[in-house]
């Protein structure tokens, strides 16, 4: 049973990585023809993070609006943990060492998210990643960060330990 669960974890993470790359490419392609003048669409990779919590303000607002309420407090924290890890990855995409650190942070955040909402995980993951990678330059930075660690071996926690990946 443990081997099949571990295999499921590896398969799921593999699908997520492929999904991330494909989504990033789609976002990059679709952004070129966009006529939107939204501030999010014209900002730098860093965007605005007025409260310096490591998450862009537009993403903070989205998380607070989408995952509001006491019942979603743990989910709100898990999504924000992932958003912070992705934002760090984008900002440090040119550094192999930092990309490896941030990739590990992203995996821990995804494990936390899977622990908090196993049935909704994929939908939430795709949704928040779309918010994070909402410009071609952000999508390119995400792909660059992943390219920095494509040969790395990042160990996954056993499923019964995913909740330990959650930051308070």
Predicted regions located by residue number:
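Calcium-binding acidic motifs and repeat modules
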Residues: 2-8, 14, 29-52, 58-168
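Sec-dependent N-terminal signal peptides
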Residues: 19-23
């Amino acid at each position: 049973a443990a081997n099949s669960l571990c295999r499921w974890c590896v398969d799921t993470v593999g699908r997520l990585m492929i999904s991330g790359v494909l989504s990033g490419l789609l976002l990059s392609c679709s952004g070129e023809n966009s006529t939107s003048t939204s501030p999010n669409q014209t900002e730098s990779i860093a965007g605005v993070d007025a409260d310096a919590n490591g998450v862009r303000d537009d993403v903070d607002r989205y998380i607070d609006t989408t995952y509001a309420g006491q019942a979603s407090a743990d989910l709100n924290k898990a999504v924000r943990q992932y958003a912070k890890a992705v934002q760090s990855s984008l900002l440090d995409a040119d550094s192999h060492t930092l990309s490896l650190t941030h990739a590990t942070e992203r995996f821990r955040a995804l494990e936390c998210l899977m622990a908090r909402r196993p049935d909704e995980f994929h939908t939430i993951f795709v949704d928040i990643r779309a918010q994070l990678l909402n410009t071609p330059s952000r999508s390119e930075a995400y792909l660059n960060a992943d390219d920095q660690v494509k040969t790395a071996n990042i160990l996954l926690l056993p499923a019964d330990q995913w909740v330990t990946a959650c930051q308070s």
